[in-house]
Amino acid sequence: MTLFSSITSISKTNTSSKSSLNSFSGSSLSMGSNSVACGGCDKPAAGAAILANIDIKAKVDLSLSAAAAASAKCGACH
């Protein structure tokens, strides 16, 4: 696959996209578009929550908020 076709396939937007990242410790990080990332149920609200508004074609805006981390809860961590 050429570099141009790789970039073209990446730049196609999907409104219901969801990204997830698993670490070696078994905890996971899951984030959908315009959502708050959760670091897993074993470490609720540890560190800053990542508020992400992602537009793959244009840019990635990340803002870190320590205040949001204190009150942010993951949907799976009840």
UniProtKB/Swiss-Prot annotation:
Region (Disordered): 1-31
GO biological process assignments: sorocarp development
Signal peptide: none
Domain of life: Eukaryota
Family label: Belongs to the hssA/B family.
PANTHER family: HSSA/B-LIKE PROTEIN 1-RELATED-RELATED, HSSA_B-LIKE PROTEIN 1-RELATED
Designated name of the protein: HssA/B-like protein 29
UniProt organism field: Dictyostelium discoideum
Encoding gene (name): hssl29
